Structures are given as C-alpha cells and as structure tokens.
C-alpha cells in the first residue's frame, strides 16, 4: 500500500478548508456531525470575548478531500452575527466562510492560531477513520472580521498522515549590540 501524498497547506494566509482544496484541484466536502445553536461555555466565551451563555452556532464536521477524511472541525460562531444560518444552509456541501461573507457581510480578515502535535483521541480516531496511535495536528483558531470582532472559535484535528503545513520564514535583522572593551 502506498499512501497518498500529504496535503500541503501554507501558513501565510487565512483561507477556508473549501478554498484550500479548490486551489489544489481537490473536491472538498463535509460530513456534518452536529449543528445546533447553544450557550457558549467558559472556554468558547473567553475566546470570543463574550459572556458565558451567549448563543453560538456549534458546527461539527468531518472535512474530506476527494472523499478522504482529513480533519475533524468543531466551529463556534456568534449566533448574533448569523441568524437563521443553520435553517437555510447545508454545510455538508457549502463553505461556512462563503456563507458568512455572502449572506451576512462578514469579512474574515485575520486569525490567531496555535498548532500542536498530539495523538488522536478515541472520537477523533472514529471520525477520521484512522488507527490508534495516529498523530494529529491539533489546531485552535480564533477568527476576526475586518471590524476586529472575534466571530469564530474553532478546534480542529488534522490527520498527521495526510496533512502538513508549510511556511516561509525571513530573517529579521536585529540591531548589533555595542561591545565595550
């Protein structure tokens, strides 16, 4: 068995999973596991700078590229900025960012993101159809609009055997310290 080449995502721009796959010539789709409006817990509320209990849309999806499970993604979006979204859209095939931009006028412009290597949990193993011990890239991101409003808190688990990240780094010159004699 030869494993397929890993999907290589750059870390230089903010884009949706759907946009990333389209740019690579791959078909993005999703399996929606959970889609509800619920009260934000402390962690979600803190990330979105709102009070605990504030209504959020919780959208949990398995993200697929050419029908292969790539990531398990749990998004929390402020319900106030996207009223009625779950009733009008099918996120098995539609892009969340595209809906937020086109229907609600939200322009996601930047994010704060952390990435760390972990071993997949039982729910992640099941959702991503992988074997025990499979490494994942755990990503936590808060996404902001052009009005500097935090509107999305997302936790993702990307299969380490199918996904990798790439970035280009540039040396920043630091001033030389004056050395005395």
Language-model-derived ranges and their functions:
Residues 4-181:
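All-alpha effector-binding/dimerization core of bacterial HTH-type transcriptional repressors
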